[in-house]
Amino acid sequence: RDMALKNTYKVTVGVIGTGNFGTALANLLAEKCHRVLLYARSKQKALQLNKTRKNGYHNIADNVKIITDVSFLADKCNLIFPIVPSINFREMMKNLSPYLKPYHVLIHGTKGFDFNKSNKSSNPLKESIIQIFTMSEVIRQESSVVRIGCIAGPNLSKEIASKMPAASVIASEFDE
């Protein structure tokens, strides 16, 4: 098989997050996948992106569909790339989790940590305990997903969009 052919794989892949990196990744996946569903939280943003087919300096590939229904995304995509800021990651996982099954594969591209404050003491004068979690740990805590990975740079979405050489690492405990 010639791996350079467009739309080589007849699968639908999901990307959560319409920021620069989420859009760049959706376009990159669109080169090899039949269809990419790009999830936007805002219906207004989704309408605008579907109409203009442009997000900042990114032109959006024809086979990328911008959606606002997270249950539809989980139903249609076994492979999902959550690409949202770390401050919103746990909330996003809580919204997505009811629709996920153990067979889903999540490869997050979120930099940073989840800082979870909990005040376990009944004494309000005592400081809160801060727990620090990776995004992979948040996925495990908030969902039934078993296969989890992480995609990381060094890469810049503008370089990816411009088809410049870029490097990424995908790490996981699983071989897929």
Sequence positions of predicted segments:
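Short loop segments at secondary-structure junctions
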Residues: 43, 143, 172-175
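Rossmann-like NAD(P)(H) cofactor-binding subdomain of soluble oxidoreductases
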Residues: 67, 72, 79-165
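Structural beta-sheet core signal
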Residues: 15, 38, 106-108, 150, ...
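Conserved residues at beta->alpha junctions
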Residues: 40, 83-84, 172
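Conserved anion/nucleotide-ligand pocket segment
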Residues: 160-176
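NAD(P)+-binding Rossmann beta1-loop-alpha1 motif at the extreme N-terminus of oxidoreductases
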Residues: 4-68, 95, 99
